[in-house]
Amino acid sequence: MEINEIISPYFENGVFTGVRVTVGDEDFVIAAKDYQDGEEIPWYDAMDALYDDDLTTWNYRQACFTMAYFEDINRVLVDNGGDTLDKCYWTCTEHSGNYSFLYDSKHNLIGYYVNFSTCSVRTIKNLKTE
């Protein structure tokens, strides 16, 4: 597999942990597997659980980059034993009072949904230092 400078496998201590995405000033790793085995949870519960576990998920900009490089990201996930992006995933970005953005990987689009509805979560590790 040809690896480009934007999308590449990411390893920690020799173990594949996700896909690194480096675009402009964004540098992040999409986890190899869904958070909590892909359980669908309401947005506020998801954000609380991520906070408690010292984790995060896509911001809006990162979700846009994921959408742009969707096929390459899924190829790296599959080639290294990860799970493809194949669900609706919450982002950490609220749209308005009761709505938050989500990344619908089934249709490769970004939308928003009511916070009390349920979606899956895929964690992100930010590598960019402020």
Which residues does each PLM region occupy?
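Extracellular adhesion/carbohydrate-recognition regions
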Residues: 1-55, 87-91, 98-102, 115-124, ...
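C-terminal, surface-exposed recognition/capping segments
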Residues: 60-130
